[in-house]
A protein has these predicted regions:
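Serine residues within intrinsically disordered or low-complexity segments
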Residues: 5-9, 21
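Bacterial N-terminal signal peptides that target proteins for export
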Residues: 17-32
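Bacterial N-terminal signal peptides
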Residues: 30-41
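Boundary at the C-terminal end of the N-terminal hydrophobic targeting segment
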Residues: 42-47
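Conserved small-residue
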Residues: 48-122, 131-138, 225-227, 232, ...
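Short, structured secondary-structure elements
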Residues: 75, 110-115, 120-131, 145-155, ...
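Sequence context surrounding c-type heme c attachment/ligation sites in exported
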Residues: 137, 143-339, 380-447
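Acidic, glycine-enriched catalytic cores built around paired aspartates
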Residues: 339, 350-377, 393-394
Length: 447
């Protein structure tokens, strides 16, 4: 997929670090596909407002420079280390560079999620017998398909949004990470809020891995009803009486429920569904899937708010207290506080150990409380404020924007705003969130 027609990123020493492919190709995050119209009821009104407001010309705007400014993401940093000879990536005949890259980027194997559907440029290599594996941490997502020619990366740059790379799965003295320009054909769309972002579709999938178009599809996040999640994905974990679309395969003429059964629900193992040799984990953990979908939504919102603010400042209209920028800030705050989250009606338990690993990664306050602690009985997080508030991208938001975010959070968490959409935030929730943030987020104002 590499091309000789390429531009190179350069550091201060002028050495080539990451080649930027000039050819437009449909390379996207594994398991993540083109934004499509969401079936009735799946869209959320507030996000529709942002989605309807495009940002024409933003990629090339002087305040953004998506393809021209230096990148400061984890994959670019890894590329620099490999190019400088500071890090050697060992090649394995089965998994290629996957394991050393996961180690170098601190991406846990326990985060593995498996996609059965034929989405992405390497769709010919993907079906229920050879799923696409996705691994992630707070900043980077790595995609691997057994026997496919590429590893794929989607990584959040603190200012640029999600940046896409690919790596050839063949032995090389110094593997070269290609920055992929064509990914934005699908990864800058209505569903990503018109910024380079993340997508995670839920489809009605046929036994050969194709999406059955007659039923439409969903672009789920933490607000999406459980029963509309994970179509086209393998799912391991228990979830009581709740139903989901994972592990199910539909045929033309089926109704929406016909393929969902005891065989597809509450699976603690994928034994008998496909040959798992060549994958680092035997799981496609339900808790990892829930966390990933929440994180994808926040990733897009943080990028959108940052881009709106930087473009507005460049054009001399950076008032965060009124107009579109204020609305974008309010949407981000609502997402951080899990406003509109679909409630859980049964306990959820994963199988890979991801939940325990995630919850233990902090930071914690003096009472041992953390925004990474999971509830999984009524909702995703024990304390309903997103851990993504600690991310490098959030910290990179303009100071005035972060101040506006904190001011809006104060209105809600102090109880001054008791609008109906925040009624699921109990007084104890609000107090705990304030206390945790006051100790663990340095610039969070004391209340």
């Amino acid at each position: 997929v590499r091309t000789n027609s390429a531009a190179s990123s350069r550091d201060g020493g002028g050495e080539r670090l990451v080649r930027q492919s000039a050819v437009v190709q449909r390379v996207w995050l594994p398991g993540v596909a083109v934004a499509v119209a969401v079936a009735a009821g799946a869209a959320i009104a507030s996000t529709e407002q942002l989605s309807e407001r495009a940002l024409p010309g933003a990629l090339a705007h002087a305040a953004i420079g998506y393809y021209t400014r230096p990148t400061h993401d984890l994959v670019a940093g890894l590329a620099r280390r490999v190019e400088a000879g500071e890090l050697t990536l060992a090649f394995d005949e089965t998994t290629g560079y996957l394991r050393p890259i996961l180690d170098a980027l601190a991406v846990p194997v326990a985060s593995q999620m498996l996609v059965m559907s034929k989405t992405g440029v390497q769709g010919l290599h993907t079906d229920p017998s050879n799923p696409r594996a996705i691994y992630f941490n707070d900043e980077v997502t790595v995609g691997y398909i057994r026997g496919a020619p590429l590893l794929e990366f989607a990584v959040q740059d603190p200012e640029q949004g999600v940046v896409f790379y690919a790596l050839d799965q063949k032995p090389q003295a110094r593997p070269l990470f290609d920055r992929r320009r064509g990914c934005l054909t699908c990864h800058q769309a209505y569903t990503t809020l018109h910024v380079p972002g993340m997508l995670a579709r839920s489809v009605f999938m046929t036994p050969d891995g194709l999406a059955l178009g007659q039923f439409g599809s969903y672009d789920p996040d933490d607000r999406t009803p459980f029963e509309r999640r994970w179509g086209g994905w393998y799912v391991t974990g228990t979830h009581g009486s709740m139903r989901h679309m994972g592990n199910a395969m539909f045929k033309s003429g089926d109704d929406r429920e016909s393929a969902i059964s005891e065989r597809t629900l509450n699976r603690t193992s994928l034994d008998g569904l496909f040959d798992g040799r060549g994958y680092p984990s035997a799981h496609s953990d339900i808790v990892a899937l829930m966390v990933f979908q929440h994180q994808a939504r926040i990733t897009n919102l943080v990028t959108r708010v940052g881009w709106e603010a930087r473009v507005a400042a460049q054009e001399g209209r950076a008032d965060v207290t009124a107009g579109p920028l204020r609305d974008a800030v309010h949407e981000l705050v609502d997402a951080l506080l899990f406003t509109g989250e679909a409630p859980l009606t049964s306990p959820v338990r994963g199988t890979s150990g991801f939940a325990e690993m995630f919850a233990a990664s902090g930071p914690s306050d003096s009472r041992g409380r953390s925004l990474r602690q999971l509830d999984l009985e009524r909702r995703l997080q024990r304390y309903p404020c997103s851990y993504t508030i600690y991310s490098a991208a959030f910290r990179a938001l303009p100071d005035a924007v972060r101040a506006a975010i904190y001011a809006r959070m104060r209105e809600i968490l102090s109880g001054r705003d008791r609008s109906a959409q925040y009624e699921r935030l109990s007084d104890a929730d609000r107090r705990s969130i304030i206390e945790i943030l006051s100790e663990t987020l340095l610039d969070f104002p004391r209340m």
